[in-house]
């Protein structure tokens, strides 16, 4: 999320933030700068949030002046999921999706995801009426086609599935992911030295409406959430290796 997505007021996803020019560049743009300079970053996704009152998806300052002008980014910019819609509601800086599309592409957005509601047939009407320059369209198209050409997608548009198998679901990668996840836990409070759990404990009660709901526990940006999975369980509980029987009370009885 370029940029400032992690400092929204109250920690609210898609919220707003007020940040100084120096902090934006030295803290929030810094990881992107490293990726551009050291790794040749080819694509960037805009942040959902607004920065100092301006939604990033429609901000020429963020997507063109800073990202391209100051940071030297040469790739293409894609919208976060439905972020262009937010120019209409809730940010209310565009009256309709036609206006939102014009604002976004002029700001430096090249691709709208997940569907074309702003980048639609309406753009043709905007060009004919003089509200939008064809040069802006050509610029966005050129950026995308350049990446496709450099990746060889015109000659070979389909992935080599056999080659992919060498890199997917590797045991070493799974072990590293598990290690990273385990080390990321932060214990803020441990009353009566409850943790680590004693092996003498025979039963644990997990109480609340999210007790057995993977979607709620993992958040919306995870594979289980995408599939809208929930844990299968018996009415009287579920067996685990340790510490023993776990009893779910979803209704908080």
Residue ranges and their predicted role:
Residues 1-253:
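Glycoside hydrolase catalytic-domain context in secreted enzymes
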């Amino acid at each position: 999320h370029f940029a400032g997505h992690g400092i929204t007021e109250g920690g609210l996803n898609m919220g707003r933030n007020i940040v100084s020019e120096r902090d934006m560049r030295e803290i929030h743009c810094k990881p992107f700068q490293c990726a551009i300079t050291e790794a040749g970053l080819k694509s960037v996704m805009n942040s959902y949030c607004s920065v100092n009152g301006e939604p990033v998806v429609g901000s020429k300052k963020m997507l063109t002046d800073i990202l391209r002008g100051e940071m030297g980014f040469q790739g293409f910019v894609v919208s976060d999921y439905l972020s262009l819609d937010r120019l209409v509601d809730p940010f209310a800086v565009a009256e309709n999706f036609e206006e939102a599309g014009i604002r976004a592409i002029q700001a430096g957005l090249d691709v709208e995801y997940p569907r074309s509601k702003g980048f639609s047939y309406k753009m043709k009407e905007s060009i004919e009426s003089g509200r939008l320059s064809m040069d802006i369209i050509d610029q966005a198209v050129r950026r995308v086609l350049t990446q496709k050409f450099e990746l060889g997608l015109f000659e070979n548009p389909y992935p080599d599935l056999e080659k992919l198998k060498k890199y997917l679901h590797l045991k070493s990668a799974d072990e590293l992911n598990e290690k990273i996840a385990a080390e990321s836990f932060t214990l803020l409070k441990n009353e009566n030295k409850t943790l680590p759990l004693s092996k003498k404990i025979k039963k644990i009660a997990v109480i609340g409406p999210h007790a057995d709901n993977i979607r709620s526990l993992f958040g919306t940006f995870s594979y289980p959430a995408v599939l809208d999975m929930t844990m299968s369980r018996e009415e009287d509980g579920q067996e685990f290796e340790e510490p023993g029987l776990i009893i779910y009370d979803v209704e908080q009885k």
